[in-house]
């Protein structure tokens, strides 16, 4: 989204039409890469620096609000947990927003808790405006901070504070038309599921790296500070500050969660990075003093446990460095260097060219990005591939099945953070490990595996070929089979592929292969594939594919007790359809 000749095209095509985020980081990267180029380390450098400085600023705020102990403990968590480390290594508007909002809060705090100097207010306005251009949730957080200030401000300071708020709004005005344009196109709800009732608890687990050891160290640290500190008061003059921290941490979650449930799913863990440091400041504020030696031991323990769980429990440095596009092209251009390969992906063409230059090898490819290709066109494209090996990334399940129908031997599979890369071969290769799918049901209407619905009245036996066919002649419902989903995918994770060999003897008509998940006689998931969409030729046997991603179908529900998966053929127009195999 940076490959534009001028600023106007960047805003129009890279931001207003190509993104849902404010323009700030796009503009930063546009000019930054024009100066330093597109080396990966240089592109990420501003974000790495932002993450490092955020550690320091979080310490300054904790010290300003409470004391150095609170600041150091907060900084220790910002420095050592996956949440903050991850987004310091990604060129996205999260760690920049973290730094900007921390600086905003720092100067806001100096204005309220120290001398009311105009320079603090000016810098608060500047960083608030920057937050509004960085991310919609950093804008939301800036608004929450600003409103909280109205309840703290003294009468004599109301006018300059209100004027500062007006200045922030004025500085955001140039971006309003971009925001409205993005809003009119809808959000990310087309691919992001609504949050579940477990969202908050899962988020807390994410912060503490899903580690019981990290939780135990946190609890032990809080208990130790309370017991060892000189004194503890929940109702001293710091009470007001603690309530502010509670609001700052919880309100963005509550607003994002409510909006995602009632209007459009938007909330993700990444968006909450701007408010998370204040959770640590709150937790580590209930004390007055602690010896330097004890504090050093506590901080050392926090860092040690967080680093060990990050490296070994989370296996962070194994999975994070296997990024989607890089892994795709490593598999295609390095691992399969000796093969004649073809790449099918969903990359912006620039990515392909970038990695061709990086690995000094070029391969023919097809990208779905901006191609607007339907399933029939995709099938025709695959059938025309001349190479012997195909490497794929970011394909739908039905598309993968089409590829495998022409390249039946799966010789490679690599997965990681947000990616799956498959390698298929047209012929069985010597010394290659063939990855086979598990067959759970099949019928050719003579021999079958699984509990299929009885369609004996539709079966026609051909004595010359010793084969049977299911002939739907005026029938609306054809063969079907049901599975106890808890037996197939007890943890709610799995991919089910269905393949149908079918022929239209008279005319092509609308019929479907259908999958549904049923709970208590109610359909909670439904998916169908129009057989006609596979570009049929009358009187010719062809294959139709349907794929069910159980995790996606259940929207990350982790239990499948009481769920039934049903797959069936629906002949909506009740025309003649012959089925040879399922």
Per-range role (PLM):
Residues 455-477:
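Short carbohydrate-recognition loop motifs
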Residues 1-434:
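Terminal, non-globular segments
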Residues 523-558, 574:
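Extracellular carbohydrate recognition and processing domains
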Residues 574-582:
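Exposed low-complexity, polar/acidic, P/S/T/G-rich flexible segments that act as propeptides
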Residues 443-445, 483-513, 542-552, 582:
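Extra-cytoplasmic beta-strand recognition segments
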């Amino acid at each position: 989204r940076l490959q534009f000749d001028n600023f106007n095209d960047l805003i129009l095509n890279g931001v207003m039409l190509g993104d849902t985020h404010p323009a700030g980081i796009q503009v930063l990267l546009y000019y930054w890469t024009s100066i330093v180029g597109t080396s990966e380390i240089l592109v990420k450098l501003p974000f790495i620096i932002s993450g490092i400085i955020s550690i320091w600023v979080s310490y300054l705020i904790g010290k300003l609000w409470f004391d150095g102990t609170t600041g150091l403990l907060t900084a220790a968590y910002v420095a050592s947990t996956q949440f903050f480390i991850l987004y310091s290594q990604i060129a996205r508007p999260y760690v920049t927003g973290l730094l900007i909002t921390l600086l905003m809060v720092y100067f806001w705090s100096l204005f309220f808790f120290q001398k009311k100097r105009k320079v603090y207010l000016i810098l608060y306005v500047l960083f608030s405006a920057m937050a509004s251009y960085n991310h919609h949730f950093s804008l939301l957080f800036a608004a929450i901070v600003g409103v909280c200030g109205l309840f703290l401000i003294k009468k004599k300071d109301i006018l300059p504070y209100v004027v500062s708020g007006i200045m922030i709004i004025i500085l955001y005005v140039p971006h309003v038309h971009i925001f409205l344009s993005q809003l009119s196109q809808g959000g990310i709800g087309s691919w992001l599921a609504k949050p579940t009732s477990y969202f908050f608890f899962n988020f807390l687990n994410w912060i503490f790296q899903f580690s019981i050891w990290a939780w135990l160290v946190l609890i032990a640290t809080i208990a130790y500070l309370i017991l060892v500190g000189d004194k503890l008061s929940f109702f001293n003059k710091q009470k007001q500050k603690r309530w502010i921290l509670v609001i700052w941490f919880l309100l963005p979650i509550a607003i994002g969660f409510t909006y995602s449930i009632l209007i459009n799913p938007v909330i993700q863990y990444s968006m909450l990075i701007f408010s998370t440091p204040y959770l640590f400041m709150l937790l580590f504020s209930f004390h007055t003093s602690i010896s330097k030696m004890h504090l050093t031991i506590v901080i050392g323990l926090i860092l040690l446990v967080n680093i060990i769980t990050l490296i070994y429990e989370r296996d962070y440095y194994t999975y994070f460095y296997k990024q989607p596009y890089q892994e795709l092209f490593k598999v295609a251009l390095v691992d399969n260097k000796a093969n004649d390969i073809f790449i099918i992906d969903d990359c912006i063409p620039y990515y392909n060219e970038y990695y061709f230059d990086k690995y000094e090898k070029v391969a023919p490819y097809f990208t779905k990005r901006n191609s607007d290709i339907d399933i029939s066109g995709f099938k025709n494209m695959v059938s025309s591939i001349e190479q012997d090996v195909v490497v794929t990334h970011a394909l739908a399940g039905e598309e993968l099945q089409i590829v495998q129908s022409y390249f039946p031997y799966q010789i490679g599979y690599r997965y990681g953070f947000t990616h799956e890369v498959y390698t298929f071969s047209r012929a069985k290769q010597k010394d290659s490990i063939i990855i086979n799918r598990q067959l759970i049901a099949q019928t050719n209407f003579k021999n079958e595996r699984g509990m299929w619905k009885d369609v004996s009245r539709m079966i026609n036996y051909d004595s010359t070929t010793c084969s049977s066919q299911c002939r739907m002649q005026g029938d609306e419902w054809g063969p079907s089979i049901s599975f106890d989903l808890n037996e197939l995918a007890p943890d709610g994770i799995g991919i089910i592929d269905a393949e149908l060999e079918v022929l239209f003897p008279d005319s092509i008509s609308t019929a479907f292969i259908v999958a549904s998940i049923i709970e208590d006689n109610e359909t909670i998931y439904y998916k169908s594939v129009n057989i006609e969409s596979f570009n049929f030729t009358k009187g010719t046997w062809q294959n139709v594919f349907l794929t069910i991603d159980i995790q996606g179908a259940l929207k990350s529900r982790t239990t499948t007790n009481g769920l039934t998966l049903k797959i069936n053929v629906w002949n909506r127009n009740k025309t003649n359809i012959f089925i040879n195999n399922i």
